[in-house]
Structure formats: structure tokens, C-alpha cells
A protein has these predicted regions:
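N-terminal presequence-like segments and adjacent domain-start helices
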Residues: 1-21
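Intrinsically disordered, low-complexity linkers and terminal regions
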Residues: 8, 13-14, 59, 72, ...
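Short secondary-structure junctions
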Residues: 23-35, 84-90
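Short edge beta-strands and adjacent turn/loop segments
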Residues: 28-56
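Hydrophobic alpha-helical segments that drive targeting, anchoring, or assembly
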Residues: 40-43, 49, 61-63, 94-98
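A short interface-forming secondary-structure element
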Residues: 52-71
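Charged low-complexity stretches with an acidic bias
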Residues: 67-94
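Polar/charged, Gly/Pro-rich intrinsically disordered segments
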Residues: 87-116
């Protein structure tokens, strides 16, 4: 089991590196996109994997989700995961969208609490 845990931790580090590249790409392409993060329980991987794309405000988030940017973010996520050696049947099930504005409004800016 320890070897399995180490392998999963290594896989997560690779995933973070690939998602960082996806984030940088999106920041140059998608208006209002700020950053992304992920949560995962390695004991329930990959089912527990959740990737959250964060916008500066609700307006930019709504605009992105109404247009082609949503598909672009899902495609960037799928490519990043694939580059890390992670293949999921339904990448979109693991992707969420949020905004800094909503976090401040609903959770006082506490992302740890919001993402639980």
C-alpha cells in the first residue's frame, strides 16, 4: 500500500504541473479567468478528483460559461490530465466553476471552507 500511496502522490505532483500549464494558457485566452485548484482524496482517486476554475467575478464566469470558454476549459483540463497520465471517462463531471466574488460573498473569502 505504501508503494501505491507514493505512486499516487507522484501522479498528483505531475497532475499539478500539467494543470499549472493549463491555467497559464487559460489566463491568456479567457477573460476574467484568475486561477484553478484541485481537491482529491487519494484513497478514492480518481472518483474524488475535483478541479475548480475560478474567475474574478460572477459576470466573467457567467459570460465564459455561456460561450465557448466552458468547452475550452474542459478541454484544457482533459489535456492536462492526459499529459499527467490520468484518463477519465467524463472529465466534465470533475470540473467546477466558481468566482472570487462568490467566495467573498458566501464565505468571507475563505477558500478552504468553500471548497470542502
Amino acid at each position: 500500500m505504501a508503494g501505491g500511496k507514493r505512486a499516487l502522490a507522484r501522479l498528483e505532483r505531475e497532475m499539478v504541473a500539467c494543470l499549472t500549464e493549463a491555467c497559464a494558457t487559460a489566463q491568456g485566452e479567457i477573460v476574467g479567468f484568475a486561477w484553478l485548484t484541485h481537491q482529491v482524496d487519494l484513497d478514492d482517486f480518481p472518483a474524488s478528483l475535483r478541479i475548480t476554475w475560478v474567475f474574478t467575478d460572477d459576470t466573467d464566469k457567467a459570460r465564459a460559461l455561456a460561450g465557448t470558454d466552458k468547452a475550452r476549459m474542459i478541454a484544457l483540463t482533459a489535456q492536462a490530465l492526459s499529459d499527467a497520465g490520468i484518463e477519465l471517462d467524463h472529465v466534465a463531471w470533475h470540473v467546477r466553476f466558481d468566482s472570487e466574488e462568490a467566495c467573498w460573498r458566501d464565505h468571507g473569502g475563505d477558500w478552504n471552507r468553500r471548497l470542502r
